[in-house]
A protein has these predicted regions:
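Domain-level recognition of soluble alpha/beta enzyme cores
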Residues: 156-177
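Short beta-strand scaffold positions
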Residues: 51-52, 120, 140-141
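Phosphate-handling substructures
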Residues: 64-121
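Active-site signature of alpha/beta-hydrolase-fold catalytic machinery across serine-
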Residues: 63, 148-152
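A glycine-rich beta-strand to alpha-helix segment
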Residues: 135-146
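Glycine-rich phosphate-binding loop signature in dinucleotide/nucleotide-binding domains
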Residues: 42-45, 129-135
Length: 177
């Protein structure tokens, strides 16, 4: 089975903010970035296409010619809960952040998720796809989702997740047995 993972294009917010599941705007360069993704996907025929329901993914899927993608909550970005749209500098002064910064794999953000939580929901979704019998699929999602999918495929360990977040507009092909 082949899975094409597509990360949304650049977001139009200041660097250094935890934005997770917040529906943030895309940069004015969206069309140029999206055109590059569209060219990469050109010629591929997918058995099924999914998208995170967040606008930054849906808009890219639409631009690339997939207006009828199935929206899937399990491929949303990690939830930073109460920390959504706060700067990392601001979070470092939150007394609850020490535990998270020391063990972000297992400790959730307040009212949010841990990386393990996100990995669990993404891996359940990928298990369903594997069991479906589909041969070639495409998923428009987020950096954290693409990273979790690559961990699922055995490319690296969850501890290495933040070292391997793909760039905006990246297309990654995974081959699963």
């Amino acid at each position: 089975m082949e899975i094409y993972l597509v990360r949304h294009t650049s977001v139009d917010i200041p660097a250094g903010y935890a934005y997770g599941q917040t529906d943030v705007p895309l940069r004015p360069s969206f069309e140029d970035e999206a055109e590059a993704v569209k060219k990469t996907l050109s010629g591929h025929i997918f058995d099924k296409v999914w998208s995170s329901p967040l606008t930054r993914c849906v808009r890219l899927a639409n631009y690339c010619g997939y207006p009828d993608t199935e929206k899937e909550d399990r491929i949303k970005e990690i939830s930073f809960g109460e920390w959504e749209m706060k700067s990392w500098d601001e979070l470092s002064s939150d007394p609850r952040s020490e535990a998270w910064f020391n063990d972000w794999i297992n400790v959730p953000a307040p009212s949010g998720e841990s990386l393990q939580d996100q990995y669990t929901r993404v891996s359940h979704f990928l298990n369903e796809i594997r069991e479906s019998g589909l041969q070639k699929v495409c998923i428009f999602a987020h950096g954290g989702v693409l990273t979790c999918a690559r961990v699922y495929a055995g490319e690296y360990d969850l501890k290495e997740a933040f070292k391997n977040v793909p760039s905006y507009g990246t297309v990654i092909r995974l081959k699963l047995d």
